[in-house]
Amino acid sequence: MSKHFLNSYAQLLIQTCHQRGVLAMGGMAAQIPIKDDPAANELALGRVRADKLREVTDGHDGTWVAHPGLIELARGIFDARMSGPHQHAVRRDDVEVTAADLLKPSLGTITTAGFYGN
C-alpha cells in the first residue's frame, strides 16, 4: 500500500468497519510459492510477510491469500499480533480520509515493465 490512495482506502476501511462492529478484512496476497527457485520463492514470501504484517499492524481483523501454501504464514503473523478474534478496539479515530485522498493519482509513467511487475 505504498500509493497514497491505496493506503487511504485501507485506513478508511478499518475505521468504517470497526465503527460498525464488523470485521475489516485485508487484501489478498497475490504471490504464490515458487517451487523450483528458492531465491524467487523467498522474495515472494517476504512480500507476503511484509503485506500481512502491515495489515495486522494497521488494524485489519483477517486476511486472505491466493494459495493454500501461504495460509500458515499469514495465520502465524495475525495470530502472533492479535489477542482475540478481532481488533474492533483499533478504531482508527486518528484517520481522516477525504475524497481527494481516495482520488489522488499515482505519480509516474505507465510502462510495460511496471505492468508486469505489479
Per-region residue spans from a language model:
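Expand to "…catalyze enediolate/carbanion chemistry for C-C bond making/breaking, isomerization
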Residues: M1-N118
